[in-house]
């Protein structure tokens, strides 16, 4: 009878140990400013359950960093992402932009009623070489500060724009001067010419009349 009870407890879901429910690497390492990946395996029974990645001890009160939504969709939060492969019964955790402070105890876990199946993973972070850190800093500074070449190109472009605008200004002034000549000075000249013609015309008529009068009244020889 006790053997039947033991077998029943073994096959009941949730009664197996954490190592039997979810497994993974006991230790992983990554380099500062790099990334690392952890693959946690689980039995087919937990296919439709939420999986998570948490940090800290004790394990029952660890801080959950990221958790799936019972699907195979990628879930990302800050620098940590998780994806569940329900065909191969593996969920993959990726940590990016690693920092020295990321080193510590983590857990692969499955959310269920009662104690969650969990597996302990020790994460180690190796310090990045100084040359790599200097290269990263130089790249950031280069992206922030404008290069002298670009600045020179901008100045040459502005100078060309100013030079090209001067002929347009001269052409506009010439057009305005021509219009003033046509609409102001030309009518003035025509008016002066008309006045001169009007003044000189009566004088000619008056002179011609006097000559005729002299001829008419001159004595006959």
From Swiss-Prot:
The transmembrane residues are: 178-198
Signal peptide residues on this chain, from the entry's feature table: 1-18
Report the InterPro entries cross-referenced here.
Answer: CD300_family_receptors, Ig-like_dom_sf, Ig-like_fold, Ig_sub, Ig_V-set
Mode of membrane association: Single-pass type I membrane protein
According to the entry, every stretch annotated as the Ig-like V-type domain falls at 19-124
Record-linked Pfam families: V-set (PF07686)
Q: Which SUPFAM superfamilies match?
A: Immunoglobulin (SSF48726)
Q: How is it modified after translation?
A: O-glycosylated.
Spell out the disulfide connections.
Answer: 40-108
Q: Which tissues does it occur in?
A: Expressed in dendritic cells, macrophages and granulocytes. Present on the surface of granulocytes and monocytes/macrophages (at protein level).
Q: Would you say which domain of life the source belongs to?
A: Eukaryota
Chain ranges sitting on the Cytoplasmic side read 199-221
Q: Which GO terms describe its biological process?
A: immune system process; regulation of interleukin-6 production; regulation of tumor necrosis factor production
Molecular function GO terms recorded:
virus receptor activity
Localization, per the record, is: Cell membrane
Which residue stretches are annotated as topological domain Extracellular? 19-177
Q: What does this protein do?
A: Acts as an activating receptor in myeloid cells and mast cells. (Microbial infection) Acts as a functional murine norovirus (MNV) receptor. Primary determinant of MNV species tropism and is sufficient to render cells permissive to infection by MNV. Can render nonmurine mammalian cells susceptible to MNV infection.
- Assembly and interaction partners: Interacts with FCER1G.
Q: What PANTHER family does this protein map onto?
A: CMRF35-LIKE MOLECULE 1, POLYMERIC-IMMUNOGLOBULIN RECEPTOR
Q: Which family does it belong to?
A: Belongs to the CD300 family.
In Swiss-Prot or TrEMBL terms, this protein is called: CMRF35-like molecule 5
């Amino acid at each position: 009878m006790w053997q039947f009870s033991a077998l029943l407890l073994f096959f009941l879901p949730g009664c197996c140990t954490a190592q039997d429910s979810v497994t993974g690497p006991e230790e992983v390492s990554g380099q500062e400013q790099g990334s690392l990946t952890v693959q946690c395996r689980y039995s087919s029974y937990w296919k439709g359950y939420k999986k998570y990645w948490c940090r800290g001890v004790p394990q029952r009160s660890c801080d959950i960093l990221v958790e799936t939504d019972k699907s195979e969709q990628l879930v990302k939060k800050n620098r940590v992402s998780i994806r569940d492969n329900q065909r191969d019964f593996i969920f993959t955790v990726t940590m990016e932009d690693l920092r020295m402070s990321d080193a510590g105890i983590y857990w692969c876990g499955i959310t269920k009623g009662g104690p969650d199946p969990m597996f302990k993973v020790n994460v180690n972070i190796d310090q990045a070489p100084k040359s790599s850190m200097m290269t990263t800093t130089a790249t950031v500074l280069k992206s922030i500060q404008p290069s002298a070449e670009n600045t020179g190109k901008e100045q040459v472009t502005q100078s060309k724009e100013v030079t090209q605008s001067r002929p347009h200004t001269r052409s506009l002034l010439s057009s305005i001067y021509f219009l003033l000549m046509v609409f102001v000075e030309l009518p003035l000249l025509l008016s002066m010419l008309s006045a001169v013609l009007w003044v000189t015309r009566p004088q000619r008529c008056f002179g011609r009349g006097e000559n005729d009068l002299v001829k008419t009244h001159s004595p006959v020889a």
